């Protein structure tokens, strides 16, 4: 999403081209960025005056083993294209909430999507990668081959190399229930947040809910939820939606059964980034009364124009915290706020910081050093530093939350 003014954009067409680009770029005294879809909030996919390795030409999607639902996806593909390719098989992969996002960035950071509570994070569906390392070598990593590297790729891959192919195990998904619920929460913002959080946590794992709010408009605060039930049974869908609908007075609603691919249709053109987004991120175990109250104050302060909470839990918590570089497995919610100015958003957000037990790097633009330790617990960070020394000792890949030497 961040605009940039790079000096040179390289568009390799295959892994050997990516390797050649890395070997050349590392000899140049300018910043190096890697871009797949260019939609990333954190802004690591562009720079000013440097080199971008743009992966948009690597966009193939192929089924390599129907019996295990094994799918090979290149990083320049967009998630809406992946959904469309898998739909005829009755399969789907959880990703995010927008089909225009590129595979490469999301699938190396985490992936908090509409099927998250039933399928886990996107990285939890990953079975192997092909990756170009800082020295230009092309290697494979999986649980059986270079398992240390495979561990790091799942949550911090952008620090370790450029993934040129992902092998996922897709999930079996028929049509899904999708509902948009709109509430007027003006009179009780904090109470609504508590009730919605409790409803989400008590929902079966086939149900995932995303909440979007903004500052008051015409004196009203409106909350919109996007809710996905991984079922095509109408009675099941309605039973899952009712507790979410009961959290506050409804002023708008629609529900339908549709193919998963219809939720993440990609835009017709590649993303054209503009501006300098300012965002803050936090991971939350529960929406407590104290957090809800301070979040309501954040909204009324107008420091944020876009406030979103995504449901985690369910399958995302089945994975042990030390199994991947994304270690914050106790989190039930991902919280993100976008603001117009860094100073105002940081001031208000920092009052919430003590509620969080981590952050999601893809939603964070604050580059203060402590954000790195928020993103990765001490044991995880120590392990990542060891991997960095082994696979990228010269810190070729450093344009996002760089690990210190």
Descriptions of predicted regions:
Residues 1-405:
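Soluble FAD-dependent oxygen oxidases
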């Amino acid at each position: 999403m961040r605009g940039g003014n790079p000096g040179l954009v390289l568009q390799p067409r295959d892994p050997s081209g990516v390797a050649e680009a890395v070997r050349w770029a590392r000899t140049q005294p300018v910043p190096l960025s890697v871009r797949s879809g260019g939609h990333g909030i954190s802004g690591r996919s562009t720079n000013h005056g440097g080199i971008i390795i743009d992966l948009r030409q690597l966009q193939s999607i192929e089924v390599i083993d129907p019996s295990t639902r094994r799918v090979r996806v290149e990083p320049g593909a967009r998630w809406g294209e992946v959904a469309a390719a898998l739909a005829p098989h009755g399969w789907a992969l959880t990703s995010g909430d927008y089909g225009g996002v590129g595979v490469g960035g999301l699938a190396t950071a985490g992936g908090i999507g509409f099927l998250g509570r039933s399928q886990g994070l996107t990285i939890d569906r990953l079975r192997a990668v092909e990756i170009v390392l800082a020295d230009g070598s092309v290697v494979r990593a999986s649980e059986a081959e270079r398992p240390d590297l495979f561990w790091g790729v799942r949550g911090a891959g952008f620090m370790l190399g450029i993934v040129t192919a992902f092998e996922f195990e897709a999930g079996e998904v028929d049509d899904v229930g999708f509902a948009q619920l709109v509430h007027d929460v003006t009179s009780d913002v904090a109470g609504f947040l508590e009730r919605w959080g409790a409803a989400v946590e008590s929902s079966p794992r086939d149900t995932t809910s995303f909440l979007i709010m903004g500052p008051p408009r015409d004196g009203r605060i409106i909350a919109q939820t996007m809710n996905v039930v991984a079922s095509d049974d109408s009675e099941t869908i309605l039973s899952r939606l009712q507790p979410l609908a009961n959290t506050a007075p409804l002023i708008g609603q629609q529900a339908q059964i549709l193919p998963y691919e219809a939720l993440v249709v990609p835009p017709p053109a590649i993303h054209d980034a503009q501006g300098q987004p300012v965002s803050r991120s936090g991971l939350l175990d529960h929406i407590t009364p104290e957090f809800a109250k301070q979040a309501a104050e954040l909204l009324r302060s107008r420091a944020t124009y876009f406030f979103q909470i995504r449901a985690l839990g369910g399958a995302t918590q089945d994975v042990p915290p030390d199994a991947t570089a994304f270690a914050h497995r106790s989190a039930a919610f991902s919280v993100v706020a976008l603001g117009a100015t860094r100073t105002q958003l940081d001031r208000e957000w920092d009052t919430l910081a003590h509620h969080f037990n981590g952050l999601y790097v893809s939603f964070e633009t604050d580059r203060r050093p402590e954000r790195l330790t928020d993103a990765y617990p001490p044991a995880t960070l120590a392990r990542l530093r060891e991997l960095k020394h082994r696979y990228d000792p010269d810190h070729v890949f450093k344009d996002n939350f760089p690990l210190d030497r």
